[in-house]
Amino acid sequence: MTGLFVTLEGPEGAGKSTNRDYLAERLRERGIEVQLTREPGGTPLAERIRELLLAPGDEPMAADTELLLMFAARAQHIAGVIRPALARGAVVLCDRFTDATYAYQGGGRGLPEVRIAALESFVQGDLRPDLTLVFDLPVEIGLARAAARGRLDRFEQEDRRFFEAVRQTYLQRAAQAPERYQVLDAGLPLTEVQAGLDRLLPNLLERLNG
């Protein structure tokens, strides 16, 4: 049995983790095995790479270094968590995946899309998400939410231009492949966002059973 690979994407403060946990609860109520995970991270080694990526430091990180670290963590994550869970027939709910790399390292950092695509093919092979939920909201709201959480990580310290580019890249990718993406308005009250997730459940279950 093959499981279902669902990724949750969006800029800072979009509520991905909260809504990932909500969706997991709804699926588990139906007796479905759910594997919760995140990127960068998901395994002990990948989490150590995450620390390198997120921690502010004295030495600026080159954009290509950042990109390669992202895919190094992803390779470990795919081998250690994602592929085994899918082979068990689980629904994998992943907070960020390769769309985030296109958005942050491509849109935000300005790295060529072809470079990201080459690494995507090398690291992932034929693995792609079955469904991607993009939690969209205005940049100023997302940054205010991130600031309210406390100390900002290395990405959260970027300027508004960076995050506008991130947001637009997500929306462009969603528009190019509407069969895979669902865009949700993360600026709405949480109860309304989660009502939108409830409306998506039948489609998700159909994909799992199909």
UniProtKB/Swiss-Prot annotation:
What UniProt keywords are attached to this protein's entry? ATP-binding, Kinase, Nucleotide biosynthesis, Nucleotide-binding, Transferase
* Reaction equation(s) it catalyzes: dTMP + ATP = dTDP + ADP
Q: Which GO terms describe its cellular component?
A: cytosol
Q: Give EC number(s), comma-separated.
A: 2.7.4.9
Q: Which SUPFAM superfamilies match?
A: P-loop containing nucleoside triphosphate hydrolases
Look up the record and give one Gene Ontology term from the biological process aspect: dUDP biosynthetic process
ATP-binding in keyword set: yes
Which residues of this UniProt protein bind ATP?
10-17
Under the heading InterPro entries, the entry gives: P-loop_NTPase (IPR027417), Thymidylate_kin-like_dom (IPR039430), Thymidylate_kinase (IPR018094)
The molecular function terms of the Gene Ontology recorded here are: ATP binding; dTMP kinase activity
Asked if the keyword tRNA-binding belongs to this entry, the reply reads: no
The highest taxon in the source lineage is Bacteria
User: What task does this protein carry out?
Assistant: Phosphorylation of dTMP to form dTDP in both de novo and salvage pathways of dTTP synthesis.
Q: Which family does it belong to?
A: Belongs to the thymidylate kinase family.
Q: Which PANTHER family match?
A: THYMIDYLATE KINASE (PTHR10344), UMP-CMP KINASE 2, MITOCHONDRIAL (PTHR10344:SF4)
Q: What is the name attached to this protein's record?
A: Thymidylate kinase
